[in-house]
Curated annotation (Swiss-Prot):
Transmembrane segments: 40-60, 497-517
GO cellular component: Golgi apparatus; Golgi membrane; membrane; perinuclear region of cytoplasm
Origin species: Caenorhabditis elegans
Catalytic reactions on record: a ribonucleoside 5'-triphosphate + H2O = a ribonucleoside 5'-diphosphate + phosphate + H(+)
InterPro entries: GDA1_CD39_NTPase
UniProt protein name: Nucleoside-triphosphatase ntp-1
Recorded family membership: Belongs to the GDA1/CD39 NTPase family.
Subcellular location: Golgi apparatus membrane
Amino acid sequence: MRWRYTIRDQSPFEESSNCHRLTSSETANTFRWPMRTYNVYGFLLTCTCLLLILTIIPMSGGSSERVQRSVRSVVETKNNIKYGVICDAGSSGTRLFVYTLKPLSGGLTNIDTLIHESEPVVKKVTPGLSSFGDKPEQVVEYLTPLLRFAEEHIPYEQLGETDLLIFATAGMRLLPEAQKDAIIKNLQNGLKSVTALRVSDSNIRIIDGAWEGIYSWIAVNYILGRFDKENDSKVGMIDMGGASVQIAFEIANEKESYNGGNVYEINLGSIETNEDYKYKIYSTTFLGYGANEGLKKYENSLVKSGNSNDSCSPRGLNRLIGEFTVNGTGEWDVCLAQVSSLIGDKAQPSCPNPTCFLRNVIAPSVNLSTVQLYGFSEYWYTTSNFGSGGEYHYQKFTDEVRKYCQKDWNDIQDGFKRNEFPNADIERLGTNCFKAAWVTSVLHDGFNVDKTKHLFQSVLKIAGEEMQWALGAMLYHSKDLKFNLLEQLEVAQSTQQISNFFSFFVILIIVLAVALYRQLQSESTYKKYNFLRTDSKPDFLNV
């Protein structure tokens, strides 16, 4: 085979005959590549945006819910039961209670008294914490037996996770400030070295009467199941001790314009913004209106008036008030009128509000006759002594009291010897008439509860459980534990978000890598294509 060469001269400016001239269709194809590239980039950008949206939506919705369900499944297992220890440091002694706590995310804590061998884990030591006012260095040793008792009933591995609460009440309130501070400081500084329980300074303190009332209100309604979402009805409570009387009830009417104080907004839910467990409570303590302080008021009135006839004592009971001798007459109706006159402070101006407690104290415009009220302590002891404990009937109760007060004191003493009064000692029998008049007057004249149309009852136990404000305190403060659980939930959600963002960026990098690879591949193809079109034959042939 022979090669045929064609050689001719040509100007440098003359187009070579072997140079390929682009046709119009080829020109269009040459400039179509950038447009295709833009389309590819647009497509990739759209895909990226869709990926971003599909990544963010689960973070704010379904994924978050899945995380919450996952955490709840851990939180609400039987193996996640926590423990709580609380000491009720009263005036006569300190009682320790151990509770089991099962947190439920978003709602109330399921709380129960710890039971061991069919008995509640409860222990009391005497005397009261306030008796250490002049020897505060001994308070740690005083409480140590209680703490050892609690530690014996809590799994060892959970001792460090179990909070210890020590709340002191009336006895400690009466001490001088220096003695109060010394006792509290010794407990805060000394307990951490003698117990494995978790001790926090903020959980060792003196609580005021209003909060004692709130804790009682919480305990009563919790035991009765009144915090269930479908149950809107809450009960109120009146707790009369020896020195004071406490009252607490819900102000459910949002239109209530009362601004006289003693109103507290509490939230028992694990999230402050959760309105399901948020309540507005009126709670206060009236010092001087306990049964023993009331007796002092009555006795002082007899001495001041020079009246030696004691209508509030059984007939024939003669006694000394200081150096003044009074003689029991057992006149119940006279007694009731005299005691009623002691309610309120006559030195204070009359109450300008339509509703007032104890005749002088401005109160919310809530008709307590329509509120289901539970009476504790002295209300139970006094009414039950006359066979009227439980559902309260004014006429039946006063009839029984009247019969008792008219008895001769010698006959009452003989009945005591025959065990006719199993729930009272001899001193109590002498004051029964007065205390019946006092609790009645405070209820009807002090708190305006109607004598016939009302929902009041005296109780010692609710659903077989003795009411203790300590239960309410533990329930209220258990939300601190729930906040810790929420932190776990937030960490899980944060971890999920980080995972989602990481996944998004991985996808984005892959998309960009594919785009870059396609661009490089397209450029290479384009250059090769142009080369082939402009150089149809090897250079050495163009000679």
